[in-house]
Amino acid sequence: MELPAVNLKVILLVHWLLTTWGCLVFSSSYAWGNFTILALGVWAVAQRDSIDAIGMFLGGLVATIFLDIIYISIFYSSVATGDTGRFGAGMAILSLLLKPFSCCLVYHMHRERGGELPLRPDFFGPSQEHSAYQTIDSSSDAAADPFASLENKGQAVPRGY
């Protein structure tokens, strides 16, 4: 099944609008959690070639699914008494229901940018960013004996006592 081509800006706009309406009734921790992840989404829009930006946005969306379940289950009974409370809670629930679909779309964008699902032991290892620079820890003969070139040029070589 082919996923529809949805712009990341549309995903951000929908979740921003639903989060804003959800903030009418839920605590500030709901707002901080969701708006922080939306800021990561803005970073992913600004840097179109960054795998880390879209990966962090994807991970944040997954995390907010669990956080929103906790927020809604704890505070729903106390806030859904009036019309405004039911509206805000409904928008937060709608945002929660759309997040798994958004995660699928963002994961598809992550794969298009060259990312892969980090299910390896070196998950917290080096970044997957592609650049023209060589790594410092590349193996070469100069790394094995750093003072070999100094002896050949007649320069003073530091000696251990």
UniProtKB/Swiss-Prot annotation:
Localisation per UniProt entry: Endoplasmic reticulum membrane; Golgi apparatus membrane; Cytoplasmic vesicle membrane
Sites bearing Phosphoserine, chain numbering: 127, 138
Pfam families: AGTRAP (PF06396)
Superkingdom: Eukaryota
InterPro entries given in the database record: AGTRAP (IPR009436)
Extracellular side: 1-26, 75-86
Keywords: Cytoplasmic vesicle, Endoplasmic reticulum, Golgi apparatus, Membrane, Phosphoprotein, Transmembrane, Transmembrane helix
Topology term for the membrane: Multi-pass membrane protein
PANTHER family membership: TYPE-1 ANGIOTENSIN II RECEPTOR-ASSOCIATED PROTEIN
Descriptive protein name: Type-1 angiotensin II receptor-associated protein
The species this protein was found in: Mus musculus
Upper lineage: Eukaryota, Metazoa, Chordata, Craniata, Vertebrata
